[in-house]
A protein has these predicted regions:
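Flexible loop residues that form catalytic
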Residues: 16, 70, 129
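Alpha-helical scaffold segments that flank or form the walls of functional sites
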Residues: 77-127, 131-149
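Short C-terminal domain-edge/linker segments immediately following a structured domain
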Residues: 37-44, 67-69, 83-84, 94-97, ...
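Short capping/connector residues at structural and topological boundaries
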Residues: 19, 27-28, 65-66, 94, ...
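Alpha-helix boundary/interfacial micro-motifs
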Residues: 21, 27-28, 34, 42-43, ...
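Histidine-rich, glycine-flanked metal-binding segment
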Residues: 1-6, 13-61
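Hydrophobic faces of well-ordered beta-strands that scaffold small-molecule active sites
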Residues: 63-67, 124-126, 151-154
Length: 154
């Protein structure tokens, strides 16, 4: 019997393979933070895992990719929610931009990354247009690295 760190069993697995297969009563084996095997329920009998997750009635699918985010804006949620886009930009975003420093950008990005991960997103493409002082984008990319999300900076 092979050893593994984690086994997820009894799941509906959305494979996203070429044929868009869905595996009922599926099993995913993870070892050293890498998926090492995916298959039907019979796969579970081939492995002994330190941690077993019974995902009966649950769906497992690959991480989502967000192709458009502004992580620094995480701190602006709720401001101007009753406004149309350009009114919101003028009254909320543009008036707040000059207050953003490195620390605020870092914690806004960190919070945004945590929210993304919590909702199943594993990769973010972030557009940082708040450049009120040099190096603010470095704080955003550092937050991505610290939280462990895959990040692309645009």
């Amino acid at each position: 019997m092979k050893k593994a760190d984690v086994m997820i069993k009894n799941a509906y697995i959305i494979t996203m393979d070429h044929d868009r297969n869905i595996i009922s009563n599926g099993c995913i084996v993870i070892d050293k933070d890498k998926i090492t095997a995916v298959g039907g329920g019979e796969l579970a009998s081939c492995y002994e895992a330190s941690r077993v997750v019974d995902a009966k009635g649950k769906f497992v699918f690959p991480g989502m990719i967000s192709t458009h985010s502004h992580l620094f804006q995480t701190m602006l949620k709720g401001l101007g929610r009753d406004k149309l886009l350009f009114d919101w930009l003028d009254s909320s975003v543009r008036t707040a931009l000059h207050r953003f420093d490195g620390e605020m950008c870092y914690y806004a990005a960190l919070t945004g990354c945590m929210e993304a991960i919590q909702s199943g997103t594993t990769t973010l493409l972030d557009y940082m247009y708040c450049h009120t002082s040099p190096g603010l984008s470095d704080y955003v990319t550092q937050a991505m690295e610290d939280i462990g999300i895959r990040g692309i900076y645009g």
